[in-house]
């Protein structure tokens, strides 16, 4: 039997298993009356569990060598979507298959592929970029992120990844980010984060539903966590709102010609991640918290700037008053000696464009991925680390790692934009940064 036949048999067994379980449940529930209700219900569960055990043991009993060969061949052959869904199906067979898939299917950082939902919060590939595009619907104030499946972006249906919905408020604008294309709300189980702006649209904070662990030891669920089991939740600690990045656009009060200038402080990514041998520590094991209490666990971070009011009152304006643009440009927000001795967060800045005399416009080399000039277009690179006070300024040019484009975003058609990202950003982080470019910015152009 070929490995394709095995995969087909596995997928077919899912459907028959679901139908049999449903039929057994209906048959048992139809006879539930009086004092026999509890006994009949337990019998139904026993039948379903037995059926599940039989089906799972059938596939779990495969020799590990054969299973490894099947998964490895499938991983190599089904490298693109939509055929890559077969790899996801194999991971859902049973625990043994799932563990084997975790062993063979690498993260996007090393394989350059988006396979599981968890891949959306893992760093992109070190070599090359993952090409995506964003569709905007102005009438619904929604934005949908798709994975490119072909080089023809305008004719590409794409593989859906994430969605966002804009909510305008009196003093700010919020973009709710979800894994569901239609149900885009904070109350949904597919909600994974949000983007929030200040009144002028010059500063944005990216919030994640999970804290950035950063290799820190997570304290056990104690008294401070158990108190959230009650109906009264502290208003100063919203569920699943962890500040992981801040995007700042420089004010253009003089109205001079030129593109926007922006900086991104990635609190969950150390500056050393873009250096040779650098890594992004504390990558999540699941895309949403396992339990409600985990959304409230506090963690140690790189520096004082990476905490940034984890438990804050969203009705106040403290979100954006703790940092000046000049501080962000230098790569740190708190300039004290203690903060400089610790690991600094990664700072991204937009690559400076060049003025084209014939076209009379500012130009960036998007290598054909952007075709329409727009003030929203940008390319982000790593900002060089600022030397400590009193240290001599290095005269040698920046290392090649500093010149690599980490994220690029640009317009290709009406309400259609391309988004290409690479390590150390994840798809979620890149999407949130690009959403900030859509927002109206007073005194920035």
Curated annotation (Swiss-Prot):
InterPro entries: F-box-like_dom_sf (IPR036047), F-box_dom (IPR001810), Tubby-like_C (IPR025659), Tubby_C (IPR000007), Tubby_C_CS (IPR018066). Residues 56-102 form the F-box domain. Gene3D superfamilies: 1.20.1280.50, Tubby Protein, Chain A. CDD domains: F-box_AtTLP-like. Ubiquitous. Belongs to the TUB family. This is Tubby-like F-box protein 8.
């Amino acid at each position: 039997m070929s490995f394709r036949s095995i995969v087909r048999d596995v997928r077919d067994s899912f459907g028959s298993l679901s139908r049999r379980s449903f039929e057994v449940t209906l048959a048992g529930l139809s006879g539930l009356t009086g004092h026999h209700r509890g006994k009949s219900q337990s019998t139904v569960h026993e039948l379903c569990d037995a059926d599940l055990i039989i089906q799972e043991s059938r596939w779990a009993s495969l020799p590990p060598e054969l299973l490894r060969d099947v998964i490895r061949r499938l991983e190599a052959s089904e490298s693109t979507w939509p055929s890559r869904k077969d790899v996801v199906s194999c991971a859902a067979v049973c625990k043994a298959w799932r563990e084997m898939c975790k062993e063979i299917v690498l993260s996007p950082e090393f394989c350059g592929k988006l396979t599981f939902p968890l891949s959306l919060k893992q760093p992109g590939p070190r070599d090359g970029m993952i090409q995506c595009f964003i569709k905007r619907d102005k009438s619904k104030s929604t934005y949908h992120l798709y994975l490119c499946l072909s080089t023809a972006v305008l004719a590409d249906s794409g593989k859906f990844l994430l969605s966002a919905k804009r909510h305008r408020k009196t003093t700010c604008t919020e973009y709710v980010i979800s894994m569901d294309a239609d149900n885009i709300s904070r109350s949904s189980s597919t909600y994974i984060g949000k983007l929030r702006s200040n009144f002028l649209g010059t500063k944005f904070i990216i919030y994640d539903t999970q804290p950035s662990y950063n290799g820190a030891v997570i304290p056990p669920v104690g008294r401070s966590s158990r108190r959230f089991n009650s109906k009264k939740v502290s208003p100063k600690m919203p569920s699943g709102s962890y500040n992981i990045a801040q995007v700042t656009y420089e004010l253009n009060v003089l109205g001079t010609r030129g593109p926007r200038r922006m900086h991104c402080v990635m609190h969950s990514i150390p500056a050393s991640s873009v250096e040779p041998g650098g890594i992004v520590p504390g990558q999540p094991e699941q895309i949403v918290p396992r339990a409600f209490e985990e959304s409230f666990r506090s963690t140690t971070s790189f520096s004082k700037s990476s905490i940034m009011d984890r438990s804050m009152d969203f009705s106040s304006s403290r979100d954006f008053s703790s940092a000046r643009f000049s501080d962000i440009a230098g790569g740190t927000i708190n300039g004290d000696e203690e903060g400089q001795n610790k690991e600094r967060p990664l700072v991204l800045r937009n690559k400076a464009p060049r003025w084209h005399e014939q076209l009379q416009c500012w130009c960036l080399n998007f290598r054909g991925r952007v075709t329409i000039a727009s003030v929203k277009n940008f390319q982000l690179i790593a900002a060089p680390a600022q030397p400590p006070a009193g240290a001599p300024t290095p005269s040698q040019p920046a290392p090649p790692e500093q010149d690599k484009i980490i994220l690029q975003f640009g317009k290709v058609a009406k309400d259609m934009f391309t988004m290409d990202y690479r390590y150390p950003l994840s798809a979620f982080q890149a999407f949130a940064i690009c959403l900030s470019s859509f927002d109206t910015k007073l005194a920035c152009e």
